[in-house]
Amino acid sequence: MFVSIPSIRKTVMSLCAVPLMAACAFAPGMRFDPQRPLDPADNASVPKITQITPDLVRGGQAQVPRENVDVDQLLAKATPYRIGTGDILSIVVWDHPELVFPTQTYSIGSAYDIANFAGTPNVPGYVVSTGGDIQFPYAGVIKVAGRTQNEVRDEITRAIARVVKDPQVTVRVLAYRSQRIYVDGEVKTPGQQSIDDVPMTLVEALNRAGGINVTTGDNSRIRVTRGGKQWVLSMPALMHQGIDPASVLLRGGDIVRVEPREDSKVFVTGEVVRPSTVLPRNGKLTLSEALGEAGGVSPVSSDPRNVYVIRRAAEGEPQVYHLDAKSPVALALAEGFELRPKDVVYVDAGGLVRWSRVINLLVPTATPLIGAAAVAK
């Protein structure tokens, strides 16, 4: 059967024409369609798009809400250490060594910081019982839990004054075992820490843990847990507000966790020069900074009128923000729009670029047909 050359050419053109007319629909790669429902079975699940405008930025809606910015409950002045259950006390009555019994000698490991005690781990001491008391010669049972060293000293002095003339008493805490905090996360030496006579501030706790890991730790997301309540503290934000981080006083049972920086990363994808993940600096990252870290929008393939920020919402459906960045003035709006952890910044491709990509896919398919037509001719 004879097939004419014009017929072959018409067939080739017909095969190419259909996908070309639907180039945008069949173009490879991602594309954001604001009219496409999130759930194919629910036509009403079209995402709501919020325009990034000067009013949005001025109204503060473009700012990231700060978690538990009210840190007043954590701020306190340091007070003298108060003795607790399990602490070991040294009680010395000068010129009366008979008041120190050999049976009151305890072995204290190097985990406890006993300063200036002749370098020996075996020291005479009195362990505070679970009831919060100790027993001392000629003084009987003394309640010491919740009291300072000076308060205990004064009571013992009064109690033994009837048998010891002008007693000179010294009371020290040898081992601090009653109150502990726990430091976890991105610090060099996470673990348990005992609260002692040095006020356990946030700065002190982090220093004892070796400091925040500079490569993986996020100093803008330090989580403090106390009694079921949590605060997320930012060192830069505290200092910006004029609050000394050393004024954050920790209590026994507190948990301090330094969150990893990786948890705060933002994804920049689409038609940018370098699709990548971007980490915030000092807990803050704007849309303009994220685009800048990715090399900016691609001058060849991007449609700067369609810059989107996709944010996961608590209720499940994503929040979508749109910026028309065709004009460089729009970058000022982008600088005022703060990104949140795990936001996705997407720059759409231009219509001509999508059409060109379809052509590039069709050319390898159409070339053999065109070659066959030439041979038949």
Swiss-Prot record:
Name the chain's protein: EPS I polysaccharide export outer membrane protein EpsA
The UniProt keyword set, sorted, is: Cell outer membrane, Ion transport, Lipoprotein, Membrane, Palmitate, Polysaccharide transport, Porin, Signal, Sugar transport, Transmembrane, Transmembrane beta strand, Transport, Virulence
Pfam families according to UniProt? Poly_export, SLBB_2
Q: Where is the lipid attached (S-diacylglycerol cysteine)?
A: C24
Single GO term (MF): polysaccharide transmembrane transporter activity
Give the range the annotation lists for the signal sequence: 1-23
Q: Which GO terms describe its cellular component?
A: cell outer membrane; pore complex
- List the coiled-coil residues: none
Taxonomic source organism: Ralstonia solanacearum (Pseudomonas solanacearum)
Q: What does this protein do?
A: Probably involved in polymerization and/or export of exopolysaccharide EPS I which functions as a virulence factor.
Q: Which family does it belong to?
A: Belongs to the BexD/CtrA/VexA family.
Where does the record place it? Cell outer membrane
The annotated topology with respect to the bilayer is:
Multi-pass membrane protein
Lipid modification N-palmitoyl cysteine sits where? C24
Q: Name one GO biological process term.
A: monoatomic ion transport
